[in-house]
């Protein structure tokens, strides 16, 4: 199905973006955020989404660090808080459901296991669409078959047969980006973390309460149950295994794989597996990071997971999407030359991305120990870390580093002074 929503722009800025046509591939989080700032700075963005409608499935995600400032500048911070899941924290539990460690939202200054702002991915996608739909052209149910970069434009051939010319093309289409595969020479930039993860929704139970519960079973298996704000519960199943391309199986095969892997896991896993059978929002992926020497080629650049996925383990994917989109739009508005704009975008973002992608060695083994002894030791350690005095000390030690991570340029004032 091919459909289009086309609206006129409401903002116009006197800068190098004025009247430029920019194709953004991907209507998740990074793409619409970029579209918002591009149209605000004077461009004509077009957001292209392969799915016939918004993809509103997904688990709870959070916004951290300077990402919060970006949503404030978009004037959607209040809406995000209103639609947040209201999770109170995460409890590490054993097979009997007993809490071994607990981290409230306030732990680590609101930047811990559960951040101050937690929202369902689908809710956030809807908020961004609502914020941009009146000023941005959206095309659903189509995708690029070819992207040909010319000296003064990019010609894109769509699966629908349409051919259009753009000044710039931005790939914001996720870790397995089609844009990246069409344009960039590095065909294998994904560094696998040897862990698989599945997300889906199950019926709510009174035992779910308002806290997430995280359970580990031997064999590197994890079961996470998270309450949402829609009267249901979000389940997450993950297991450690060397990369075997399970993400390429069809959904029924992936569900059967999980039934087999978690059959004897214990805790409330039988209930989760029962809900898995009828889950219609099932999503399965191999965890990995995207690492490229360069995020642009000619008039095409990458944004968010497509260019620098940090993986869910980092907890920084959504934040990188917001910050990257803001900086990319700002630098494109400052520089008439797209090469210089992309260079500055990368110069500002790459140090932050490098920090976000730094995962503690052995972090997957810590998150999902292989043995009962390993699980017990890890839970004991987390029980000690969860003590208020310890979390307070860790917060003080890391707070200064957090502040230094990224400083957002004030592009509104910069453009006003040009």
Q: What does each model-found stretch correspond to?
A:
Residues 7, 11-22, 39-41, 64-201, ...:
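Conserved N-terminal helical subregion
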Residues 53-69:
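Conserved N-terminal glycine-rich FAD pyrophosphate-binding loop of Rossmann-like flavoproteins
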Residues 149-150, 226-228:
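Short beta-strand micro-motifs enriched in acidic
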Residues 160, 209-221:
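Mid-domain catalytic core of redox enzymes
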Residues 205, 218-219, 228-233, 239-314, ...:
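FAD/FMN-dependent oxidoreductases across multiple families
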């Amino acid at each position: 199905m091919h459909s289009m929503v086309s609206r006129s722009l409401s903002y116009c800025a006197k800068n190098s973006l004025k009247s430029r046509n920019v194709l953004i591939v991907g209507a998740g989080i990074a793409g619409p955020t970029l579209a918002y700032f591009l149209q605000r700075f004077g461009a004509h963005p077009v957001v292209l989404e392969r799915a016939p409608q918004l993809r509103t499935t997904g688990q709870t995600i959070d916004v951290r660090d300077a990402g919060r400032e970006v949503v404030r500048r978009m004037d959607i911070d209040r809406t995000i808080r209103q639609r947040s899941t209201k999770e109170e924290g995460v409890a590490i539990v054993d097979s009997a459901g007993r809490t071994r460690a607990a981290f409230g939202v306030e732990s680590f200054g609101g930047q811990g296991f559960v951040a101050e702002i937690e929202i369902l991915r689908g809710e956030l996608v809807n908020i961004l669409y609502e914020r941009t739909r009146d000023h941005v052209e959206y095309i659903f149910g189509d995708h690029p078959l070819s992207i040909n970069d010319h000296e003064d434009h990019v010609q894109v051939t769509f699966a629908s047969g349409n051919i259009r010319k753009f000044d710039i093309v931005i790939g914001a289409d996720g870790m397995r980006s089609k844009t990246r595969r069409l344009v960039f020479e590095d065909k294998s930039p994904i560094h696998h973390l040897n862990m698989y993860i599945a997300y889906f929704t199950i019926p709510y139970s009174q035992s779910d309460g308002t806290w997430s519960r995280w359970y580990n079973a031997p064999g590197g298996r994890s079961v996470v149950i998270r309450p949402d704000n829609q009267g249901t519960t979000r389940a997450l199943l993950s297991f450690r295994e060397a990369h075997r391309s399970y993400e390429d199986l069809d959904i029924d095969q992936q569900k059967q794989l999980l039934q087999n892997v978690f059959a004897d896991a214990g805790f409330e896993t039988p209930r989760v597996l029962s809900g898995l059978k009828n889950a219609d929002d099932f999503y399965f992926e191999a965890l990995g990071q995207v690492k490229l020497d360069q995020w642009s080629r000619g008039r095409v650049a990458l944004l968010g997971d497509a260019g620098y996925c940090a993986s869910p383990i980092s907890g920084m994917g959504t934040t990188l999407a917001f910050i990257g989109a803001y900086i990319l739009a700002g630098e494109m508005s400052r520089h008439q030359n797209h090469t210089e704009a992309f260079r500055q975008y990368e110069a500002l973002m790459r140090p932050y991305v490098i920090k976000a992608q730094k995962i503690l060695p052995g972090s997957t083994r810590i998150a999902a120990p292989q043995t009962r002894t390993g699980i017990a030791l890890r839970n004991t350690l987390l029980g000690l870390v969860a003590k208020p005095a310890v979390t307070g000390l860790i917060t003080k030690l890391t707070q200064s580093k957090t502040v230094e991570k990224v400083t957002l340029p004030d592009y509104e004032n910069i453009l006003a002074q040009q």
